[in-house]
A protein has these predicted regions:
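Class I SAM-dependent methyltransferase Rossmann-like catalytic core
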Residues: 45-78
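Conserved SAM/SAH-binding beta-strand->alpha-helix loop
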Residues: 124
Length: 153
């Protein structure tokens, strides 16, 4: 008898979000692409508009994904056998870490509803709004608390 686990997961994946960003970025003129890349300040800029948000994922998404997957592999397996966890993400950006976490959990047959809540902290209101949108899409059962806070606050 075959057993198919009933895994609650998002129909979205980070790979699909990344591909949409790349598809948006690719047809831009070389000048537009370079201007956006310059605006990103090597990934350290305070992003203020949708174009910058899209460019950031297109430019840096794969790098973040690789680092995050490596880190998630280091999570002790006993963590996944507890009563659920809270994720605190200081400098959450657009929620790349949360999206990659969802993909990682799905690859390990761990229900997304295992994450009870998220505390998202980010200085950029635009980033934070997009992060909340993605966390809601990827973790529909989780509670979300947000803090829009600058480094000096």
């Amino acid at each position: 008898m075959n057993y198919t686990p009933n895994i609650q997961k998002s129909s979205q994946t980070f790979v699909s979000v990344l591909q949409k960003a790349k598809d948006w970025f690719a047809p831009l003129s070389k000048t537009e692409q370079q201007n956006l890349i310059d605006d990103l300040e090597h990934g350290a800029a305070h992003l203020t508009n949708t174009r910058q948000l899209n460019a950031y994922i297109a430019k840096y998404g794969e790098i973040h994904q690789a680092k995050l997957l490596h880190a998630y592999e280091k999570i002790p397996s006993k963590v996944w056998h507890e009563d659920g966890i809270t994720v605190v993400d200081y400098g959450c950006g657009q929620g790349i870490a949360e999206m990659v976490l969802s993909d990682y959990m799905a690859s390990r047959y761990i229900d997304n509803d295992y994450i009870k809540d998220f505390i998202l902290i980010e200085p950029s209101r635009q980033n934070l709004q997009r992060c909340v949108k993605y966390v809601n899409a990827f973790f529909c059962e989780s509670q979300i608390s947000v803090v829009c806070k600058k480094d000096n606050q």
